[in-house]
């Protein structure tokens, strides 16, 4: 009698193509798959991998963050590359001249960049300009800034937990009575 081998762990799980059926995204994947294979540059492999990622791993980055990263010494003539969205930030008044390549740039962010004399290019333009990723800076937004992440971690109420409780409603009877005031049981 043979042994029934468990094949549960045989498969290596990773994306080899994007889940999205967006034809423009798939054209970019075709282009960067070719570049990653033919140039051997690590930059192209990273871009290709990020194009496969789901939306939660391609978080948006604000224009103010891009400005802050691009103000570092020696980055004046480099192109900021973001596999995701660049959003506007109304808190900044002066935008320096920037060269940005992103999957998507919001209308107001684009207007601000162009007004400052900068440029917004697409990934196919970047491939022509810099096929190996030279003179570029790869940036990405904060992955843990999502609202859902606030609920992760040790359960709310456990000592040293900073997890946000999942509350049905924000009324006075929800998470605001017992343990929060003397009149209802006790005050913590």
Curated annotation (Swiss-Prot):
Gene3D superfamilies: 3.100.10.10. This is Large ribosomal subunit protein eL18. Residues 178-188 have a biased composition (Basic residues). It comes from Timarcha balearica. InterPro entries: Ribosomal_eL18 (IPR000039), Ribosomal_eL18/eL18-A/B/_CS (IPR021132), Ribosomal_uL15/eL18 (IPR021131), Ribosomal_uL15/eL18_sf (IPR036227). Signal peptide: none annotated. One of its GO terms (cellular component) is cytosolic large ribosomal subunit. Residues 169-188 are annotated as: Disordered. One of its GO terms (molecular function) is structural constituent of ribosome. GO terms for biological process: translation. The keyword Lyase does not apply.
């Amino acid at each position: 009698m043979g042994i029934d081998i468990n094949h549960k762990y045989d498969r290596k799980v990773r994306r080899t193509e994007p889940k999205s059926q967006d034809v423009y995204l798939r054209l970019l994947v075709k282009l960067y798959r070719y570049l990653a294979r033919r140039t051997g540059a690590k930059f192209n492999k990273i871009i290709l991998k990020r194009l496969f990622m789901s939306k939660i791993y391609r978080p948006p980055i604000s224009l103010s963050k891009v400005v802050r990263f691009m103000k570092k010494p020696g980055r004046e003539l480099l192109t900021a590359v973001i596999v995701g969205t660049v959003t506007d930030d109304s808190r900044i008044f002066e935008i320096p001249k920037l060269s940005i390549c992103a999957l998507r740039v919001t209308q107001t962010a684009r207007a601000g960049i162009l007004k400052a004399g900068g440029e917004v290019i697409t990934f196919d333009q970047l491939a022509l300009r810099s096929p190996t990723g030279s003179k570029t800076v790869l940036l990405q937004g904060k992955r843990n800034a999502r609202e859902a992440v606030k609920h992760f971690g040790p359960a709310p109420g456990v000592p040293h937990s900073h997890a946000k409780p999942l509350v049905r409603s924000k009324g006075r009877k929800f998470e605001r009575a017992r343990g929060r005031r003397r009149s209802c049981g006790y005050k913590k």
